[in-house]
């Protein structure tokens, strides 16, 4: 039986972490791609030399040519410039849009049947552009944001309640940025909704509001602490959850930046919503009921994303006709 082939476009901190996690989870063979000569080869060799200790048989190959990703089952895109202190994700748009054009051409030529997970920021605009540049089916091009934002939300809630993260369910809607919408009403601790936990005296509305804001600022907090780059362990783990659900047809319900074609009243935009990921890619988009406050925040988040996609079209007018 042929092993899965997983291509990692970009061999920086997230790319290297992804490669190691793929080996540890035995998800398949890895091709690390990067335009910088020696980087993917060196990281691939380093991780391969950990395999006798960690006990995995994944083959790791480093390449500088898109031909190396040919026939990949999954492609995870991290290529581009990461944030530095004082930068917003949106500040990266002009630089990373050009990167997405190159990546899209590579995917179109060498991996047109792949399931593609985009991590590059500003996420919602970059995954939208990548789908257009590549021409791959919208069900097979998704953005990794909601899984990460939801994981941060869950972690902060578990810390507040002093319970296991395994017993906290929570998710985030909307764009991957300051306008994201952590869904308090749909978040629970062992099935108990957060509003009920406030009534029970476990926490206060003010404390929950602080946790929501810390979730929105989660990436910036890490950027500020690292000073030389951005988060990579949690983003990599989040993308692996998505890839594993696709490769194993697990049909997990995961919040992802998915293409909406009328759901939530939105058309032609990638935005974070809960979806089912299985062997067919994004097999279903789950529409949840939003109250007036949630709807207003979601619409504001969508408007922010649409502003970014319009900025993309100004830089690359050909996107308007794709």
From Swiss-Prot:
Q: Where does NAD(+) bind?
A: 10-15, 34, 96, 119-121
- Reaction catalysis annotation: (S)-malate + NAD(+) = oxaloacetate + NADH + H(+)
Q: Name one GO molecular function term.
A: L-malate dehydrogenase (NAD+) activity
Enzyme Commission code: 1.1.1.37
Can you tell me which residues the record assigns to a coiled coil?
none
UniProt keyword Magnesium present: no
Query: Which residues are annotated as active site?
Result: 176 (proton acceptor)
Q: Which residues bind substrate?
A: 83, 89, 121, 152
Highest taxon of the source? Bacteria
Q: What class of enzyme is it?
A: oxidoreductase
Its keywords, alphabetically, are: NAD, Oxidoreductase, Tricarboxylic acid cycle
Pfam families assigned = Ldh_1_C (PF02866), Ldh_1_N (PF00056)
Quote the HAMAP family the UniProt record gives: Malate_dehydrog_3
Per its database record, what is this protein's job? Catalyzes the reversible oxidation of malate to oxaloacetate.
The similarity annotation says: Belongs to the LDH/MDH superfamily. MDH type 3 family.
Name this polypeptide is given: Malate dehydrogenase
Q: What species was this sequence derived from?
A: Mesorhizobium japonicum (strain LMG 29417 / CECT 9101 / MAFF 303099) (Mesorhizobium loti (strain MAFF 303099))
